[in-house]
Amino acid sequence: VLALDYRWSNEQQFQTTREWAEECFGKHGLPYAIALHAPDPDGDPRNWHAHVMSSYRPMTRVGPNEWEVAEALRTDLDNPRSMQLLRENFARAMTRMSREAGQCERHTALSHAARGLPVEPQQHLGEARTRKARSGEYVAAN
């Protein structure tokens, strides 16, 4: 799941996500699918995000709805360093689109801790507890 800038058009959001996915997966012959998600009607209206699904098994399109699927996985790309590179590449893609959109914001792949920010990690509430919190009910978390 990739957080996107809510001020951008859907085209800009999709373009940023597609360029990132092509750089990280497509150029290695790996398939990917992108879905842009609008914020939940009851949630934060800034929560535009993309879901990206990929595989480490290379695929080549050989016809309409027809793919040649490799037998071997790209295990060389499935490691902690590659996960960090995914984050770094997305930060660069977000920064590039920010400049194109005239915002000139710089995005980073660094965690809050690595940036020296005193922010405690929060617990994921899940759908049921989020619904309770939004309705004004007390939820013992964060």
Model segments located where?
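Active-site-flanking beta-strand signature of metal-NTP-handling nucleotidyl enzymes
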Residues: 1-3, 56
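A short, contiguous, amphipathic alpha-helix enriched in charged residues
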Residues: 6-36, 88-89, 93
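Broad gene-expression machinery/nucleic-acid interaction feature
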Residues: 29-31, 47-51
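Single-stranded nucleic-acid nicking/binding segments centered on His-rich, glycine/basic loops
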Residues: 38-48, 55-142
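"Short basic amphipathic alpha-helical interaction patches in structured regions
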Residues: 13-20, 49-51, 66-68
